[in-house]
């Protein structure tokens, strides 16, 4: 097992500054080459402690901001306009990047596409839901209205 310090958030593993133990192959072949982690040292541990103190102070402010944004996201549905066939099937699927753009266009704030989770592929016109992870403790459910785009003549 390899002991590492994460330099970025890794899904299912931790956030920046966390000390984790992973299998050697995962560390050697994935985390270290991509710059997601560095090797743990005693000096690095002191640096991690100072980073965690600073992060704890920021987390309180970020939590309040995330809760406010979650309330805003849940207050109104987000409308996405896509080209669709006669029976309501979309030409292509709605992606997380499309949802992020629609949220920003609706004036509900900026959301990273990697923090959006779609429960299933959205390939039809209608009402759907998406989960947005704004903070470790705050997950907002966004109502999506997918409508067919009007034909241009």
Curated annotation (Swiss-Prot):
InterPro entries tied to this protein: Ribosomal_bL9, Ribosomal_bL9/RNase_H1_N, Ribosomal_bL9_bac/chp, Ribosomal_bL9_C, Ribosomal_bL9_C_sf, Ribosomal_bL9_N, Ribosomal_bL9_N_sf
Keyword rRNA-binding appears in the UniProt entry: yes
Domain of life: Bacteria
The entry's keywords: Ribonucleoprotein, Ribosomal protein, RNA-binding, rRNA-binding
Signal peptide: none
Any one Gene Ontology molecular-function term assigned to this protein's record: rRNA binding
Gene Ontology CC: ribonucleoprotein complex; ribosome
Biological process annotations from GO: translation
Pfam families to which the protein is assigned, alphabetical: Ribosomal_L9_C, Ribosomal_L9_N
Family: Belongs to the bacterial ribosomal protein bL9 family.
Function per UniProt: Binds to the 23S rRNA.
Name listed for the protein in its UniProt record: Large ribosomal subunit protein bL9
Organism: Micrococcus luteus (strain ATCC 4698 / DSM 20030 / JCM 1464 / CCM 169 / CCUG 5858 / IAM 1056 / NBRC 3333 / NCIMB 9278 / NCTC 2665 / VKM Ac-2230)
Highest classification ranks of the organism: Bacteria, Bacillati, Actinomycetota, Actinomycetes, Micrococcales
